[in-house]
Swiss-Prot record:
Positions bearing N6-acetyllysine: K4, K28, K35, K42
This protein's name: Cytochrome c oxidase subunit 4 isoform 1, mitochondrial
Family: Belongs to the cytochrome c oxidase IV family.
Gene assigned in the entry: COX4I1
Positions bearing N6-succinyllysine: K4, K35
Cell compartment(s), UniProt: Mitochondrion inner membrane
GO biological process: mitochondrial electron transport, cytochrome c to oxygen
Pathways per UniProt: Energy metabolism; oxidative phosphorylation
Transmembrane segments: 74-99
Length: 144
C-alpha cells in the first residue's frame, strides 16, 4: 500500500467570507454525472434547470454565503465548559475553607478591632493627618 501525501504547493479549498472565490473547486474528482453536467454547462445556461445550476454550484463551492454566515451552537459548549470549571473551582474553595483553613484569628473580632482602635487613639498615632487627627480628645468622640 502506497501512501500519497498532499502536495501543499497547490492551493487548497477553503470556505471563507473574506475570500469568497477559492482558487480550486470543492469537488476535485468528478463522477460521471458531474462530468456530463460540466459538459452541459458549456452550452447556454438558460437550458439548465434550477437543480442543475445548484449542482454546478455545489461542485465549485461547499457552502453558500447564507450557510457560512449561519450561527453555530458552539457558544453553548463554551458557556457550559466555563460554568463547569467555575463550579468545580467553587467546590474546591468550599472544601478548602472547611478542611484546610483554620478559624479566623481573634484580631478579626469586632471587639478586638475596637480595642486596637482605642489603643491607637490613646497613643495618638499619626496626629497630623491620620487617625488621631479625626478624634476629639475633649469630647471623647469622632470629629464631625
Amino acid at each position: 500500500s502506497v501512501v500519497k501525501s498532499e502536495d501543499f504547493s497547490l492551493s487548497a479549498y477553503v470556505d471563507r467570507r473574506d475570500h469568497p472565490l477559492p482558487e480550486v473547486a470543492h469537488v476535485k474528482h468528478l463522477s460521471a454525472s458531474q462530468k456530463a453536467l460540466k459538459e452541459k454547462e458549456k452550452a447556454s445556461w438558460s437550458s439548465l434547470s434550477m437543480d442543475e445550476k445548484v449542482e454546478l454550484y455545489r461542485i465549485k463551492f461547499k457552502e453558500s454565503f447564507a450557510e457560512m454566515n449561519r450561527g453555530s451552537n458552539e457558544w453553548k459548549t463554551v458557556v457550559g465548559g466555563a460554568m463547569f470549571f467555575i463550579g468545580f473551582t467553587a467546590l474546591i474553595i468550599m472544601w478548602q475553607k472547611r478542611h484546610v483553613y483554620g478559624p479566623l484569628p481573634q484580631s478579626f473580632d469586632k471587639e478586638w478591632v475596637a480595642k486596637q482602635t482605642k489603643r491607637m487613639l490613646d497613643m495618638k498615632v499619626n496626629p497630623i493627618q491620620g487617625l488621631a487627627s479625626k478624634w476629639d480628645y475633649e469630647k471623647n468622640e469622632w470629629k464631625k
